[in-house]
């Protein structure tokens, strides 16, 4: 049975699934309020070092750069509508291939063209991040975001990080105004 996390909680993926080599991170959401405008949310991953900054601009994985330089992190494609049940976007991570100088994978979701469309996370419900053992399909951990983020246009859902020889999953749920640009700047992306 999957571990259910609350904001700030963490779990050792290594202890919960000792034989897992490849993790699948699923991110999902539903739009609850819309004025008819298209609603496009995008998942992205920042591969950061000890200083909390990306190792290079190519260590930012998203719909226009779907694979990390080491090949370990692969975005599975952009879902432009968020329709349907289950994961809206997925990222596959080969934990055995993540470069040693990458200390943390930060998973974020942003609203595309949020300002011009007057959209924010207050219009989004049922958001979640889950980690699945890709080798056997079993869900290891899940974080259901519950806070109302009525002004934020970007959200860090969670992180996979190294702790000694272990990989851990931390539930973050931190919102940001300023969308993708604000998140990218915070993580050292040159925009």
Swiss-Prot record:
Residues 77-88 have a biased composition (Basic and acidic residues). It comes from the Bacteria. Disulfide bonds: none annotated. InterPro entries: Stress/Tellurium_Resist, TerD. Residues 69-88 are annotated as: Disordered. Pfam families: TerD. One of its GO terms (biological process) is response to tellurium ion. Keywords: Plasmid, Tellurium resistance. Belongs to the CAPAB/TerDEXZ family. Not known; seems to contribute to the tellurium resistance (Ter) mechanism. This is Tellurium resistance protein TerE. It comes from Alcaligenes sp. The gene is terE.
